[in-house]
């Protein structure tokens, strides 16, 4: 994990509160920025930080496995090499999402890209896109997509 800040003793209570506030604000911005594009390159974090390395590892595992509809959190845990509770704590802390939400949101973001490309090319239907990104039930895909983006896949294609 690592330290985000340190204070020398004796410390001023106001200084402690200011540091905590800054850390929480930075974490919130980090989560918000990551949740928008799910890209670690856009994050303003030291390249050698443990958080950036962890997110890069998590992203590479999901990128390698997202098409597999059987890829679940248990597989994610095994590939990342940490316990379920630690994985969920780190994912929640860094991205504001559980490991399962992270996988699903990655798939949904890819599906959105495919739908937008498909709007022009018209080479795939919604079910094919759902299968392409690792969903094995197009109806479940549509429910998740609609909940995540507040628009149905079909209406995204029509606009």
Residue ranges and their predicted role:
Residues 7-9:
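A Lys-centered signature of the CheY-like receiver
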Residues 11-20:
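C-terminal output helix
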Residues 21-37:
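The C-terminal output helix
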Residues 39-56, 60, 64-70:
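Regulatory hinge/linker segments at domain boundaries
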Residues 59-71, 91, 95, 113-124, ...:
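Basic, amphipathic alpha-helical hairpins
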Residues 73-103, 130-152:
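Basic/polar phosphate-binding segments, predominantly the helix-turn-helix DNA-binding elements
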Residues 93-136, 158-159:
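Terminal helix-turn-helix DNA-binding modules in bacterial transcription factors
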């Amino acid at each position: 994990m690592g330290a985000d800040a340190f204070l020398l003793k004796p410390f001023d209570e106001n200084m402690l509160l200011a540091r905590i506030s800054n850390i929480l604000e930075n974490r919130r911005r980090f989560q918000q920025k990551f949740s928008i594009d799910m890209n670690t390159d856009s994050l303003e974090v030291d390249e050698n930080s443990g958080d950036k390395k962890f997110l890069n590892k998590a992203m590479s595992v999901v990128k390698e496995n997202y098409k597999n509809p059987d890829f679940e959190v248990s597989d994610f845990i095994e590939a990342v090499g940490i316990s379920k509770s630690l994985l969920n704590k780190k994912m929640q802390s860094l991205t504001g999402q559980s490991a399962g939400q992270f996988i699903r949101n990655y798939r949904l973001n890819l599906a959105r890209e495919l739908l937008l490309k498909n709007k022009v090319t018209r080479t795939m239907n919604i079910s094919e896109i759902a299968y392409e990104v690792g969903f094995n039930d197009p109806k479940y895909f549509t429910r998740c997509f609609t909940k995540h983006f507040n628009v149905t896949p079909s209406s995204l294609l029509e606009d």
